[in-house]
Each structure stands twice: as C-alpha cells, then as structure tokens.
Amino acid sequence: MFPVFPCTLLAPPFPVLGLDSRGVGGLMNSFPPPQGHAQNPLQVGAELQSRFFASQGCAQSPFQAAPAPPPTPQAPAAEPLQVDLLPVLAAAQESAAAAAAAAAAAAAVAAAPPAPAAASTVDTAALKQPPAPPPPPPPVSAPAAEAAPPASAATIAAAAATAVVAPTSTVAVAPVASALEKKTKSKGPYICALCAKEFKNGYNLRRHEAIHTGAKAGRVPSGAMKMPTMVPLSLLSVPQLSGAGGGGGEAGAGGGAAAVAAGGVVTTTASGKRIRKNHACEMCGKAFRDVYHLNRHKLSHSDEKPYQCPVCQQRFKRKDRMSYHVRSHDGAVHKPYNCSHCGKSFSRPDHLNSHVRQVHSTERPFKCEKCEAAFATKDRLRAHTVRHEEKVPCHVCGKMLSSAYISDHMKVHSQGPHHVCELCNKGTGEVCPMAAAAAAAAAAAAAAVAAPPTAVGSLSGAEGVPVSSQPLPSQPW
C-alpha cells in the first residue's frame, strides 16, 4: 500500500517532480543546493525533499513521523498495601513465638513433679475486695481516626495473623506432647535382669538376653529337664516378694521381677534357656514363675484338702488329682503310659517317671544331712528326716512319735463311728481337740523333763548324770 499524502498529487509524477526530458539533472537544477552547506548527500537529499513538498503545498513531509506529544505528568504511585501490613505481620510473628514459648513452658511444668506446698503469702483479705474499675480509654483525635487503615486492610491483617499463629503453635506443642507420651509409656512387664529394659512378651526378652549371654534364643526341647529354683530366705523381706504370693497383681510381676532376678533367682535349664521365677514361698523359699503355681504349692504346707470325691468321700489337696480319682470309679481311666521295665500302665507321664525313679532306678540323688541315708525322691527324704525330729508320746498308748505324725497316729485310736473319747465322752470319727491338746501338753512336759531319746547309746544330762536311752519305737509307716 502506498501512503496517502495530505496534499493532492493528481498530476503525473514526472511533470510534478519536473522529471521530464531533462531527467533528474533538471530537477537538481530547478532546486539548486543552498550555499554554505557541506556537500553531504544525505543532507542535500533531505533539503530537496522538503523544498519539493513545500512547493506542492504540504506543510510537512509525509515520510517524517509526527512529533511525539509531550509526556503528561502522572500522579505519584500510591504506596502498596504490603508496606502497611509489615508492622502487623511482624507483631503476629512475635505473638506466635511468644505463644509457642508459653506452650513449651506449660508442658515442662506439667511434666515436672509437684513442688511441696509452701506457706501462702497472698493477702486473702485483698482477694475478697471487688476489683477496681479499669481506667477510661484515652480520647481518639480526628486525624488519628482518619489515619486508621481501611476495613479491608484490617481484615487482611487479621487473616494473616491467624494463618501465621495457628500452624506455629501446633508445631511447637506437638513435639513436646509426643516426647512426654513416649517417656511415660511402659512397654511391658518383661524386664531384663541385666539392663532393666522392658519388653512386651517373653520371646522378645529371650532374644534380647541372647545379646548379653551370646547364646542363641530358641525353643526348649520337650525332654529338657527344668532345674528347681530356690530363693534365699533373706529375699522374703523384700516388699515385692511378700505381696506377690497373696495378691498376684501386676506390680509384683513388674517390680518384684527385677528385685528377685538381681538376687540370683534366674535359673538356666540344660538347653540354655533362662527362667525367671519371681514368686517365692514364705515357708520354704521355693520360687515359682506365677502366682497360680505358688498357691498350689502352699497347699503342701497345710493339711487342708478342699476337694472331696463324690463317690468315696476321699479328700484331695488339688482338683486335678481329685478328677483323676473320680475317673477311676467309672473304670474308664485311660492309661497310655507303660513302664518299659515291668509293664505297669499309668494315666499321667509324671506318675510313670515317679514310678521309674522309686522302683527301678538305682540313683539316689536326695541325701540326708544328718546321716548317710539317700533316697530316690524328695518325698521319701522328707519322711526320713522326720526320724531325726523331736519325739512326743501318745497320751493313749504312750508310744513315742514325731510331732509331724502325732495327728495321723491319733486316728488309729479313734477309728469307727462308735468310738468314745476318754476326755470329752463324745463319739466321733475324727481327732478330738481336747485329746490333741492333751498330747501337746504331754509332749511339752516330756521335753522339759528329759532330752529326746536317740539311736546312739546314751546321753549325759545337764549335771553329768547319764540318762538311760531306749530304742526308737517303730514308726507308723
């Protein structure tokens, strides 16, 4: 497209420009260059062009750009809103930091033990007086009111403060609460005897104990022999042990375990497994792994037999023994355990083992401390130890018996429902309390008069007078 000039150029270009037969040279001659100018081709061309358009009635060359309008003065830019919010944001951050510090201090105070109560120094009379009214607020001047930020700025500032404070306070308080929860939480009642570390179950405890001992934790084979654990009687004074037998609570299982294990109660089986027995008997010092077995063991120290057979009225100390006895009345007792020596059958494996030790075995591991006798079972050793105890006479027949068997011997004189006691004149099938008291008094008198007879020759009295000895009477068993 050709530019449209402000002047009318309807004539052919050559006559108008004077470019007829004379050519460009004629045009140059019609507009001679001005005098005093340097012969610069560009300047000469520009002057010729301006003269040409001036002769044609154009005030300005169409090829020259219009002069740019003068710049209009602009109003100074208003300060951005962020400049006004800088003090508000700074105050919000300071308040968030103060809130986080206050939350951390409150958590530390809650975790610390309570301090002993001190004497109060607060004036209670002053507390009962009504509080003084607050001072009136200072008047607000008009320029200050005009200088207040607009509502939109206040809304944005409040939103910014809320967005800054909420996450900061949550992040500051959450780690403190989680740390306190981890510190106070207990893992379990299984405690390592060497480093006091707690575990939830016995398997994890055994795996941990393998680190201290170097032994590989594993299952105990079925044929492994468990060695009995004896607790020193000095440990019975520990509060955890004395309460473990009666209550059986979790406190005795937790705190008492560490105390007993430190005293050497942890035993090791033939396979290398360590067994902790926390509950000790107060009478003999034998330890057990739980309260159930301890209470069952305590029945052996008493004459109580709470379980009675409904068929023959025979009494038992343990319920399982009574159940096996009741099955014998029906003739349906299954005895799968056979002795390889004599072919005798038993209903329980412990009965078979006891039979083999007592009848067929020549090993005598239980030895008497007062003589050279040895026995295959602990029960037989206990029965033999009674021979070395003090003898008491029977008030009926005068036979000298041990104090442990005097009650059983009195039943010999009171067998049958038609027996009449010589002391109370009552017919009874049990031991008379008056007869038992008389036997105890006679035993005390006999012990005060003379020393108990022994199987060794004769003994010397307190004043050197020999006391005649008599042979030991036959035992009721």
Swiss-Prot record:
It comes from Homo sapiens (Human). One of its GO terms (molecular function) is RNA polymerase II cis-regulatory region sequence-specific DNA binding. This is Myc-associated zinc finger protein. PROSITE patterns: ZINC_FINGER_C2H2_1, ZINC_FINGER_C2H2_2. The modification Phosphoserine is found at residue 361. The gene is MAZ. Keywords: DNA-binding, Metal-binding, Nucleus, Phosphoprotein, Repeat, RNA-binding, Transcription, Transcription regulation, Zinc, Zinc-finger. Residues 59-78, 121-146 are annotated as: Disordered. A zinc finger (C2H2-type) spans 190-212, 279-301, 307-329, 337-360, 366-388, 392-413. It holds the Pfam family zf-C2H2_4.
